[in-house]
């Protein structure tokens, strides 16, 4: 790589040139400088690859996979200028040779950089990934040997209608009952919550039959997801066909993962860890696709060896905002099943179901993790909203003809609106709503008529927060004319022009979202609040004062002074990432005027599946923008899938 350009530059000049062209960040250059200080003889190639590895983390990757990445064209979603290409290393074999012979690189984590096959890690990311893989392996080796007859009788009671067709909810409960970890994945409407409630009934009833009582903790990554699960679990527990004592022993309160692990202000560490584990026999985590590698490592570290972990989520949704795609990696082959014969026999014995169609093959072998993973395959909600379910499946299958057909076939629930950037159709849609899905005008009218009694304000606020979920505008982008920042500004200006909102920062009806955790207030990143008048005593007289109402996972309303909220933003529009864990009656997705690297199949699928009744696509460009997004899959570099399916083996003991 001794080009004329490079020979005239120092290694640092070359990195700075890449930074100035937005191919590296200041942080990436700083890491390379630090490594050069630690090892003055480090080569340019190794320093550059270290900087790129750091840069990859900003895009959600845990490592730099030298086998799958062509640096010149794929690291940044665009081709760098020709003069910059000369600064990049040559062939992958050359990179690997330089790394294998560098004192900065090892295979065991003793150096700042770790090379695992073709994957280059910063040491911390490698250590977290290894910790997660090892913890999963330990839980897979923890077997709960239940007599098949007892388990079968309990499953029959909880699933009395299981017939000739395989009941995958029943299969999921059976698999999760026999090991220290269970993974249940499925799309919206497949009954993930129903399954986990029956699993709780199954495990608690079996424990109480032995004069024990399981300590159960329920959690979700965000406050919104926790609140949704709290509501749905509370309703379904009462319908369980179990003894009253068992039903009373099943908790319905769901907390956030941060609260579960015990946040510590001004610290990235949690109160619960290996030396101070959670007091729980069973931990269930919903919306697990939102969990990044750091959080998963912290969760697993905080569990006692005997604690059973159940992960629940949709493997096809967007991966976590931070680095890693843990749920996607763990469930990568869930649609294939890959069940071994002993698992097939176990399900036949306990559920009476035949899952041999999902047996492993020589080309697709299944290891221990596959034996503890169940994919729910029946959409029970499709009768109520068939269009949304059909569109989601078509997007997930990357089937563009079926995507177009779904919009044509289900015009009552699916809509495509071509828009121009200079018209006001977007604002009109949001203000007026559609059908029985109320828009912003109705919301502001209700905000303008507060109750007269203080004791009525909590219920009023709860109703308004629910009304806020009637419709939600989403975008896959944060910046630019079609990103949430400018969309929120645009909608705010229109509300002001319509005399619905005054020209000031805080006003009744302004919805806001937390952009970072506030441990003192007990509010988490992603929590949504609504600015409302609240009747309070002031100078001995009742007065309406501006406050922000948040609904906590347990349903209580928390009123906060606007001045106490530092990290918030207006949220008439939110990113698709931030919408995860939420459900809206009517979801509207903005697509920009041209394809974008962030627009992927997973993003479109996640946006579609946020809608309960109605989905509207607002297209500022040609239909090809949607086509491009549906055909583009999200890929995150990591080694977890390889570790999970290559190195983990079935326990020597099994409860079959």
Question: Model-derived features: where do they sit?
Answer:
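C-terminal accessory regions
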Residues: 527-541, 545-648
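Residue-level recognition of short, solvent-exposed, well-ordered loop/turn junctions
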Residues: 304, 507-508, 524, 579
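Intrinsically disordered, low-complexity N-terminal extensions of AAA+/P-loop NTPases
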Residues: 1-84
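Interdomain "pre-motor" coupling segment immediately N-terminal to P-loop NTPase/helicase cores
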Residues: 85-147
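Single conserved hydrophobic/aromatic residue that forms the stacking wall/gate
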Residues: 647-656
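ASCE P-loop NTPase helicase motor core
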Residues: 170-173, 179-406
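Conserved helicase motor core of P-loop NTPases
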Residues: 316, 320-512, 518-521
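N-terminal pre-Walker A segment at the start of P-loop NTPase domains
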Residues: 152-166
């Amino acid at each position: 790589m001794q080009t004329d350009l490079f020979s005239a530059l120092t290694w640092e000049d070359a990195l700075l040139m890449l930074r100035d062209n937005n191919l590296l960040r200041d942080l990436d250059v700083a890491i390379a400088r630090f490594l050069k200080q630690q090892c003055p003889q480090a080569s340019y190639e190794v320093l550059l690859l270290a900087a790129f590895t750091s840069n990859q983390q900003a895009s959600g990757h845990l490592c730099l996979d030298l086998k799958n990445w062509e640096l010149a064209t794929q690291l940044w979603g665009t081709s760098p200028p020709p003069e910059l290409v000369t600064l990049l290393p040559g062939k992958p074999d050359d990179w690997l040779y330089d790394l294998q012979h560098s004192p900065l690189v090892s295979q065991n984590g003793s150096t700042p950089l770790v090379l695992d096959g073709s994957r280059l890690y910063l040491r911390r990311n490698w250590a977290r990934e290894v910790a997660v893989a090892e913890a999963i392996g330990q839980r897979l080796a923890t077997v709960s040997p239940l007599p098949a007859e007892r388990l079968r009788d309990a499953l029959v009671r909880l699933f009395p209608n299981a017939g000739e067709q395989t009941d995958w909810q029943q299969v999921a409960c059976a698999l999760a009952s026999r090991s220290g970890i269970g993974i249940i994945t499925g799309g919206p409407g497949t009954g993930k919550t129903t399954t986990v409630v029956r699993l709780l009934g199954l495990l608690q009833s079996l424990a109480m039959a032995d004069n024990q009582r399981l300590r159960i903790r329920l959690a979700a990554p965000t406050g919104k997801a926790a609140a949704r699960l709290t509501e749905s679990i509370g309703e379904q527990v009462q319908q369980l066909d179990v003894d009253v004592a068992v039903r009373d022993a099943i908790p319905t309160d769901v907390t956030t993962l941060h609260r579960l692990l015990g946040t510590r202000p001004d610290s990235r560490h949690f109160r619960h860890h290996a030396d101070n584990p959670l007091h729980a026999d069973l931990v269930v985590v919903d919306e697990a696709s939102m969990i990044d590698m750091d959080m998963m490592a912290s969760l697993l570290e905080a569990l006692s060896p005997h604690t059973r972990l159940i992960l629940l989520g949709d493997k096809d949704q967007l991966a976590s905002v931070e680095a890693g795609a843990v749920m996607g990696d763990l469930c990568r082959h869930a649609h294939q099943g890959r069940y071994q014969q002993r698992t097939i026999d176990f399900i036949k014995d306990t559920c009476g179901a035949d899952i041999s169609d999902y047996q492993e093959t020589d080309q697709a072998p299944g290891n221990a993790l596959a034996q503890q993973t169940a994919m729910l395959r029946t959409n029970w909600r499709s009768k109520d909203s068939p269009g949304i379910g059909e569109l989601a499946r078509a997007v997930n299958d990357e089937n563009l003809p079926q995507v177009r057909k779904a919009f044509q076939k289900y015009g009552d629930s699916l809509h495509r609106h071509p828009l121009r950037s200079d018209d006001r159709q977007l604002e009109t849609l949001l203000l007026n709503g559609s059908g029985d899905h109320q828009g912003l005008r109705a919301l502001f009218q209700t905000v303008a008529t507060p109750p007269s009694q203080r004791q009525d304000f909590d219920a009023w606020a709860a109703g308004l927060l629910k009304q806020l979920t009637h419709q939600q505008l989403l975008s896959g982008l944060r910046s630019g004319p079609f990103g949430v920042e400018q969309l929120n500004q645009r909608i705010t200006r229109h509300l002001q022009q319509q005399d619905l909102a005054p020209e000031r920062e805080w006003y009744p009806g302004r919805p806001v979202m937390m952009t970072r955790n506030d441990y003192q207030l007990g509010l988490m990143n992603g929590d949504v609040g609504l600015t409302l008048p609240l009747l309070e005593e002031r100078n001995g007289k009742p007065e309406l004062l501006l406050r922000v109402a948040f609904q906590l996972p347990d349903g209580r309303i928390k009123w906060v002074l606007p001045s106490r909220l530092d990290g918030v933003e207006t949220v008439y529009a939110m990113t698709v990432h931030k919408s995860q864990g939420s459900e809206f009656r009517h979801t509207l997705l903005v697509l920009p005027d041209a394809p974008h690297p962030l627009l992927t199949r997973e993003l479109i699928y996640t946006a579609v599946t946020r809608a309960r009744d109605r989905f509207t696509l607002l297209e500022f460009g040609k239909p090809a923008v949607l086509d491009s997004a549906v055909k583009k899959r999200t890929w995150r570099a990591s080694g977890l899938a390889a570790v999970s399916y290559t190195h983990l083996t079935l326990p020597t003991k099994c409860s079959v």
